[in-house]
Amino acid sequence: MVNDLDVYVATSMRNKQDFIEMANTCEKIFKDPKIKDFHLRYFDPTISAAFGHEDKGIIECLMVRCTKVLIYSAGIKESYGKDAEAAMALSTGKPVIFYCMDSTKADFYKKVHPLTKLIDFSTGVANGAMVTFQVQEVVELLRRIFYNLMEYKLEQPKKGYFRLVEVSTDSAVRVQTNDELLTKSFWNYFDRFVKE
């Protein structure tokens, strides 16, 4: 059954209000008419339970591994758990949507934070998160992902430096650097590591 998971919602909830807000957010996303007919199977973090924190961690890692898309719900406070879940999804090449409460935090993740783009361990390609602060944009991204209607543009801010940018969120989802030393060092090590 876990291999049927479409969307994993990564979040951290510390108090009753956090649980209520997360439940409302999940309802707004997954009951939206644009995607309701998909009958997406998603992990609702407000009803998660396990016998202990070790079991909970193992279950959640398995769900992240099996899901098709991960939504990272950036709350007021950050937590290691949801950061690790987003990192696992990015490092396995999955689409990751960062949903932020406000545009300031969204801009931080989109334009400043270096780890919203991580290397896909199987290909060596940089995989970046799509970042938004609007629930409707999360819904639209899910619709486009599952209908295979994603739209991208290729940017070249400097000679030899390329960014593949998701159009609606203006988020870089793939990056190629023009730093020759970094490129050669990376691929020499990565290729050797993969062959071992």
Give, region by region, the residue ranges found by the protein language model:
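Conserved catalytic or regulatory cores that recognize and/or transform ribose-phosphate-containing ligands
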Residues: 1-196
